[in-house]
UniProtKB/Swiss-Prot annotation:
EC numbers, comma separated: 2.7.7.23, 2.3.1.157
Entry GO CC: cytoplasm; membrane
Region (N-acetyltransferase) residue spans: 251-457
GO molecular function terms listed in the Swiss-Prot or TrEMBL record: glucosamine-1-phosphate N-acetyltransferase activity; magnesium ion binding; UDP-N-acetylglucosamine diphosphorylase activity
PANTHER family: BIFUNCTIONAL PROTEIN GLMU, NUCLEOTIDYL TRANSFERASE
Species of origin: Clostridium botulinum (strain Hall / ATCC 3502 / NCTC 13319 / Type A)
Name of this protein: Bifunctional protein GlmU
UniProt subunit comment: Homotrimer.
Linker as annotated region, ranges: 230-250
Segments for region (Pyrophosphorylase): 1-229
Binding site for Mg(2+): 103, 227
Binding positions (acetyl-CoA): 385-386, 422, 439
Highest taxon listed in the record's lineage: Bacteria
Length: 457
């Protein structure tokens, strides 16, 4: 059986009050429309078509790696009109098409699979997704036959007294036999107060043709649409709970999961402990037995097993197993830190490689450098990597001891097994096995304060 999907992503999203199309706003690190696309893919649906309109180029840019096709809806004349705009996608296809909305990011791949299975096994012409809610005010009601089939969808304003008591509501997501849908679209009109073409009318047309219409009931959170920043926040809360629950089931400890923020594509190994206030973003991979103390942010990075991070920021970098980072360290993009290293408080590392067992304990800046293993950086060391025009490189070998308050003026090389005296400004290569001293000789002028009249008596 051939299955495909159409995702409606042309809405203007006026209530978002944004220059961006609504569907590219993110929920837990991923655009809403990409949540829908990815879950459709997980349900083994290969052919996906996006109906786009406002901000179409922006939507294309955010979905360009998703292998989807596009249909253009120049004017937004209703959901039915949006599907009409995708007729070319459906042309010459036979099978089943599901229709989803790009602003409902909480739909799961399990529900999508259930929708197709229910529709195809029951040989329905149309199947819709519904939900039961305590307060259905404002929603279209699902009215069923005694057999359980869907009889009709009635908009709230058109409900009679009995229909108002119904708490099963329409989600705006459907499954259709493609041939039935295309035939029904030919009979769709915009004879209503808004002058729009409604997809709900296709259900009525299908029913009048004598075809079966079914419905599956899912939790309300799965059909939640996002039309405002408030609803975006509500969707974020639901998604975050799902994400954190998944990690806890997989063996991750959260001290307070309500105040831990993890993007949907993050992977975390078992026996890792996460304290409140941590933010883990992008495609970060955290291995087992790590400890992330409060107020740490990690984005698009790989963290080895047994790493401890405390009150620090790690961006687009790799941290080797057994390393400790922080408190208050800043690991900038393109940094690779080896195993069992120590990156301490108020240390900033940018676009550098740090070897195994190297200690950079406090108040140090390292940029555009290659640092070997078992090195020690004293407090206040600065790699002076910028000459006013471009960044220069510093190379430090293994077992180098860098004294406190040292400036390494790039480009410069410090070879293996070297010492640099505290307070030095290094501008030339330091040979292997040597001690480098680059500071002025101390001069003591005895009696100077008394001569200047500065000595307090």
């Amino acid at each position: 059986m051939y299955n495909c999907a159409i995702i409606l992503a042309a809405g203007k999203g006026k209530r978002m009050k944004s220059s961006m199309p609504k569907v590219v706003h993110k929920v837990c690190g991923k655009e809403m429309v990409n949540h829908v696309i990815d879950n459709v893919r997980k349900a083994n649906i290969k052919d996906v078509n996006l109906v786009i309109g406002k901000g179409s180029e922006t939507v294309k840019e955010h979905t360009k790696d998703r292998n989807v096709t596009y249909s253009m809806q120049e004017e937004q004349l209703g959901t039915g009109h949006a599907v009409i705009c995708a007729e070319e996608f459906l042309k010459d296809k036979k099978g089943t098409v599901a229709i989803f909305t790009g602003d409902a990011p909480l739909i799961t791949n399990e529900t999508i699979q259930q929708l197709f299975e229910f529709h195809n096994s029951g040989k329905y012409a149309a199947t819709l997704i519904s939900s039961t809610v305590q307060d259905p005010t404002g929603y279209g009601r699902i009215i069923r036959e005694a057999s359980g089939e869907v009889k009709k969808i009635v908009e709230h304003k058109d409900c009679n007294e009995e229909e108002l008591k119904v708490n099963e509501i329409n989600s705006g997501m459907y499954c259709f036999d493609i041939e039935v849908l295309l035939n029904s679209l030919k009979n769709l009109n915009n004879d209503n107060s808004q002058g729009e073409y409604y997809l709900t009318d296709v259900i009525e047309i299908t029913k009048k043709s004598g075809d079966k219409v079914g419905a599956i009931v899912v939790p309300y959170e799965e059909i939640m649409g996002v039309n405002s920043r408030v609803q975006l926040s509500e969707a974020e809360i639901v998604m975050r709970k799902r994400i954190n629950h998944k990690h806890m089931v997989n063996g991750v400890t959260f001290i307070d999961c309500e105040s831990t923020y993890i993007d949907v594509d993050v992977e975390i190994g078992n026996d890792t402990i996460i304290y409140p206030g941590c933010v883990i973003q992008g495609n970060t991979r955290i291995k087992e037995e790590c400890t992330l103390y409060s107020n740490s942010r990690i984005c698009n990075s790989v963290i080895g097993s047994g790493v401890i991070v405390e009150n620090s920021v790690i961006l687009e970098s790799h941290v080797g197993e057994g390393t400790t980072v922080g408190p208050f360290a800043y690991i900038r993009p393109e940094t690779k830190i080896g195993k069992s290293a120590r990156i301490g408080d108020f240390v900033e590392i940018k676009k550098s490689t740090i070897g195994d067992n190297t200690k950079v304990s406090h108040l140090t800046y390292i940029g555009d450098a290659e640092v070997g293993s078992k090195c020690n950086f004293g407090c206040g060391t600065v790699v002076v990597n910028y000459d006013g025009q471009k960044k220069q490189k510093t190379i430090i070998g293994n077992n180098a001891f860098i004294g406190c308050n040292t400036n390494l003026i790039s480009p410069v090389k410090v070879n293996d097994n070297t010492y640099i005296a505290a307070g030095s400004t290094i501008t030339k290569e330091v040979p292997e096995g040597s001690l480098a001293i680059a500071r002025s000789k101390q001069i003591n002028k005895e009696g100077w304060l008394d001569k200047k009249g500065l000595l307090k008596k």
